[in-house]
Amino acid sequence: MARYGLIGLGFGVAVSLVTVPMLAWSEVSAFERFQQQRQQAFEQHQSDFQEAFQEFQDAFHEEFAAYQEELRANWREPRISDRHRWVEYSDDQSSRTVVDYEENSITIDVPSEAGTQGVLSHLNDLLGRTMDEAYDRDEVTQRTQQRVGLGEDAPEAASDQRVLSEIKPEDLDEMISQAELEEREEPKGEESRSVISLTVPMPEQRPSRKVEEFREQIRRHAERYEVEEALMIAIMHSESSFNPMARSHIPAFGLMQIVPQTAGKDVAQRVYGEMKLLSPEYLYNPENNIQAGAVYLNILFYSYLSAIEDPESRMYAVIAAYNTGAGNVARAFVDGRNIRAAARVINDLTPHEVYERLLADLPYDETRNYLVHVASRTEAYRNF
C-alpha cells in the first residue's frame, strides 16, 4: 500500500514538472499571438489611414481641376485660393474677390452693370466674412468633403472670427482713396462681358496687426510645447503670409500649413492619443492650427531631430524638416534618410557649417529657399 502510494506521488510530481514548462510555453505563445495581432491591427490602421487620405487627395485634385474648368466660362484667368491668396466667387461666378496676402491688396471684380456701388458692396461683405462663412464658401474643399468627408471623427470648428479682422473700419477711407479702377473684357460663354475691377491696398500694418491678434495663442502654445515664439511666427509668415484660409495644392491647410497625412497625423497622435485625420474645418481654426504647428515643431525638436546637440544647428534642421520632412534633411549629410547617422555628422560641424551644408545639399530648391526665409524672419521676429 505504501509502495503504491509512493509510486502515485512520484507520478504526480512528474506530471507537475512536465506541466510547468508547458504552461509557461503556452503563456509565451499567447503573448506572441497578442503582440502579432496588435502589430497587424496597427498596420491595418496605418493602411486605412493612408488610403483615406489618398482618396481625399485624389478627390481634391479632381474637384480643383473641375472647378477651374467651370470658371473659364466667365474668367480668362481663373484664380483659386492658395497659400497666399484667398479667393471667392459669387454663386453665379460672375463676380470675384481676391485677397492677395503677399501683395497686401484686395481686388474685386464685378459685372460693369453693378457699378462702383456693387464693388463697394462686395468689399463690405468681404470685410465682414467670418472664417466659418469662408469655409462654407470654399467650393473646392466643400465639394471634396461631400465626396470623401476627411476627418469626420475629428473635432470640427472653423471660427466666427472675421478673416480680415486686422482691417479696421477707420482704414477704409484711406484704402479707397488709393484704389485703382479699371474696366476690361472677360468671357461669357462664347461671347464676352464687361467687368469693373477695383484694387485697394490693405494697411501696411496689416501683417504686424495679425501677429498681435494671434500673439496670445502663439505665446501660450510656444511655452507649452517648448518651441521658440519667433520661429513659430516666422514659419506662419513664410507658409501663409498670415492667411488663415491658406490652402496648398497638396493640400495643406491654415496658418501653419498642416498636411493631415503627415504633420497632422503626428499632431493628432500627440494631442488626442490616436492616429486620426484632422479635417480642413478643424485646421482652418487659428487656435487649432497654431497648436498643431507648435506640436509638430516640438516633435521635430525633441523626437525626430533630438540627437542634434547644438540648439542652433538643430533649429536649422527643424526649419528644413518642417518643409520637407526629417528624412530629406538627413540626405543632406549622409547617403540615405537615417537621421541618427546624419546627426553624428552634424554634431561635428559648427552651426554655420550646418546651415551652409543644408543650402548646398538639400534635395529641393524650395526647401533651400524656405530655410533662408524662415531663418532670417526668425531673427527679425526675435526683436518684434
Model-based region annotation:
Residues 226, 278-281:
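Short pre-active-site segment immediately N-terminal to the catalytic Zn-binding motif
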Residues 307-330:
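Active-site/pore-lining binding-face segments in mid-to-C-terminal subdomains
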Residues 249-276, 288-301, 346-349, 374:
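Substrate-binding/active-site groove segments that recognize
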Residues 2-8, 12, 20-237, 302, ...:
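Cell-wall glycan-active module
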Residues 206-209, 280-290, 365-366:
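Active-site metal-coordination segments of metallo-dependent hydrolases
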